[in-house]
């Protein structure tokens, strides 16, 4: 006999008991990256929560998965601080960047890792050069030189892969003619090297250049500009087997695929959708060439990803019917199969192998079982809503969902507005335990793709230029008002939460509007001038486009800094910060906390030792999630069902609790 359905318990929103604990959220926080095919196998990196979030290299072949690097080998590069493309597999040998010292290590099958580059240099995005007669194979890598920390240099270098005595040196410089360089890609005949460059103050989603140069024993000869410029973002160069160079450009207003030719660049299957994402990390791959005149491309439309098979000569495409809403790290297995990291609405991220002919996907590795039963998962609902000055903005709305509970009649749920980082990142509808943590407890969530987000074209992405702290705040406020106006949220119990650039938006919104009644700032910016002065090279001129260049725009920096709007803070603030954050240093959080304390604004502050830009340790993830839940419970007057550690909110009188 089937079980009889139980009658849902009536309980206040926010107080519902959820099977998704903070501990389960931390244990299931596995992320996959740098997926690539090599040597007839798939390789990727994933963080291991049981080892404090340490990142290990794994491979899959012959139906089995194996860990390649030993425990303790933390495979992460800090080039640009955000890293990516931290390893390369060559036959029975892998080379990887070790987080602790940023040196390249050589690991032969069955052997012990040994460093092959000196300290004070960082490496990423390495490719293999073909072995010439009687000579060793070599690597070409992006190198970041930190021998003089005040003048960091980014170059392309050549390293010998067979390193007598274990020492490669720092590498032979091939190209040093730009502030930044990425995507070194070798032509099939081994004679030409394509690569992407850009200079301050541009970010790679603003303007880059695709260059090609002849590669000789003496180095690179006279790089030639193929595409790009200060107002065109070119990414992901790839050579086809016939020697054709393909790349992605946003010259049409959307990142689309192009083929280089004698008559100029030719668009391939042009559409008003995005075929790429901002280059925050090395090694991003949003299309693969199959070697038979076809490519598999990933494109994003209204924030939802799809895959299509494209005929490169005819310019036609066929979408694949797959049960996923997010794809990344596309890689070729063979002419009939590709692999990707895929996310779905009701299952956690997986590495999947896709049969192109049938459209069938086979799971290679999963981040774990779904944290909730299917009927307990809140599905993302895309919403478009009016914002300031006639703009239309976008978001994903998640309704409170727990079959064991229903809200008290006549009440509406609290609403948590999430603000992604970047600020050019993108909210995705794929299942995230961090969202379901709230919805399964009776708290509605809106994940906002404010103006400046990627996934909606260049114009939408540039809507934040000169307007950071304005457009993003307007759009998040508009999302909340839209949901309150459609009776999906309690206007008196609205909160805002974000990290990094999203944390800055949180602070501005709290200091300049009365829409929110609580806010959580995770390592956000409080002083714009200090950010421009103190941050790392990659982002050191980012704010030039978002606000303006210094010193000309000093008055705007001052007006956009939350530290200069302290009188506007009226509601409780929770601040969470990593003590070792090189992107947004801890003094950004400490200064705003000290200022709020001095003005008796209710504030709670937690500084996490050993954490950087984004939390990785399970104990930190657990504590920060529990603290945020306790914070909203105190402010909004509901009692969470969880057993939570005490949280001190300085300046919040008990009498203020509802």
Residues covered by each model-derived region:
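Active-site-proximal cap/loop segments of hydrolase catalytic domains
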Residues: 448-658
């Amino acid at each position: 006999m089937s079980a009889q359905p139980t009658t849902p318990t009536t309980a206040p929103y926010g107080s519902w008991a959820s099977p998704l604990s903070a501990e389960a959220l931390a244990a299931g926080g596995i992320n996959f990256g740098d997926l690539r095919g090599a040597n007839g196998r798939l390789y990727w990196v994933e963080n291991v929560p049981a080892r404090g979030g340490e990142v290990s290299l794994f491979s899959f072949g012959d139906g089995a998965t194996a860990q390649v690097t030993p425990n303790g080998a933390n495979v992460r590069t800090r080039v640009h601080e955000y890293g990516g493309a931290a390893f390369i597999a060559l036959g029975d040998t892998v080379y990887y960047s070790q987080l602790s010292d940023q040196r390249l290590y050589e690991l032969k099958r069955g052997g012990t890792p040994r460093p092959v580059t000196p300290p004070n240099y960082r490496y990423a995005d390495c490719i293999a050069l073909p072995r010439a007669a009687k000579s060793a194979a070599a690597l070409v890598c992006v190198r970041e030189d930190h021998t003089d920390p005040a003048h960091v240099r980014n170059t392309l270098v050549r390293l010998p892969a067979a390193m007598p005595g274990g020492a490669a040196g720092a590498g032979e410089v091939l190209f040093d003619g730009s502030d930044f360089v990425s995507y070194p890609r070798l032509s099939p005949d081994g004679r030409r090297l394509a690569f992407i460059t850009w200079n301050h103050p541009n970010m790679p989603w603003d303007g880059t250049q695709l260059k090609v140069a002849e590669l000789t024993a003496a180095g690179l000869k006279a790089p030639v500009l193929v595409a790009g410029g200060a107002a065109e973002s070119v990414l992901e160069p790839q050579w086809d087997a016939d020697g054709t160079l393909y790349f992605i450009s946003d010259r049409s207003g959307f990142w689309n695929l192009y083929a280089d030719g004698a008559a100029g660049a030719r668009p391939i299957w042009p559409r008003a959708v995005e075929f790429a994402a901002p280059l925050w990390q090395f090694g991003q791959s949003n299309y693969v060439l199959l070697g038979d005149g076809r490519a598999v491309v990933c494109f994003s439309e209204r924030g939802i990803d799809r895959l299509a098979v494209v005929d490169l000569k005819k310019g036609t495409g066929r979408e694949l019917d797959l049960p996923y809403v997010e794809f990344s790290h596309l890689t070729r297995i063979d002419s009939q199969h590709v692999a990707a990291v895929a996310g779905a609405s009701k299952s956690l991220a997986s590495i999947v192998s896709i049969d192109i002919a049938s459209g069938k996907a086979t799971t290679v590795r999963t981040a774990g079982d779904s944290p909730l039963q299917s009927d307990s998962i809140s599905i993302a609902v895309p919403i478009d809503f009016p914002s300031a000055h006639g703009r239309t903005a976008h978001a994903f709305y998640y309704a409170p969902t727990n079959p064991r509970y229903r809200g008290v009649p006549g009440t509406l749920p609290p609403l948590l507005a999430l603000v992604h980082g970047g600020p050019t990142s993108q909210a995705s509808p794929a299942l995230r335990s961090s969202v379901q943590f709230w919805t399964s407890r009776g708290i509605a969530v809106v994940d906002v793709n404010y103006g400046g987000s990627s996934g909606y074209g260049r114009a939408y992405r540039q809507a934040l230029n000169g307007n950071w702290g304005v457009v993003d705040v307007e759009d998040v406020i508009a999302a909340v008002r839209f949901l309150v106006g459609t009776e999906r949220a309690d206007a008196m119990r609205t909160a805002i939460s974000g990290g990094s650039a999203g944390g800055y938006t949180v602070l501005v919104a709290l200091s300049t509007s009365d829409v929110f009644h609580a806010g959580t700032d995770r390592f956000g910016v409080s002083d714009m001038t200090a950010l421009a002065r103190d941050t790392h090279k990659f982002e050191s001129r980012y704010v030039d486009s978002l606000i303006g260049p210094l010193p000309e725009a000093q008055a705007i920096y001052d007006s956009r800094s939350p530290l200069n709007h302290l009188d506007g803070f009226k509601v409780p603030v929770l601040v969470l910060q990593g003590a070792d954050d090189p992107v947004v240093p801890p003094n950004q959080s400490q200064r705003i906390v000290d200022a709020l304390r001095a003005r008796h604004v209710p504030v709670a502050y937690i500084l996490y030792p050993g954490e950087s830009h984004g939390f990785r340790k399970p104990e930190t993830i657990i504590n920060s999630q529990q603290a945020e839940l306790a914070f909203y419970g105190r402010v909004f007057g509901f009692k969470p069902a969880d057993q939570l550690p005490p949280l001190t909110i300085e300046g919040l009188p008990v009498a203020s609790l509802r």
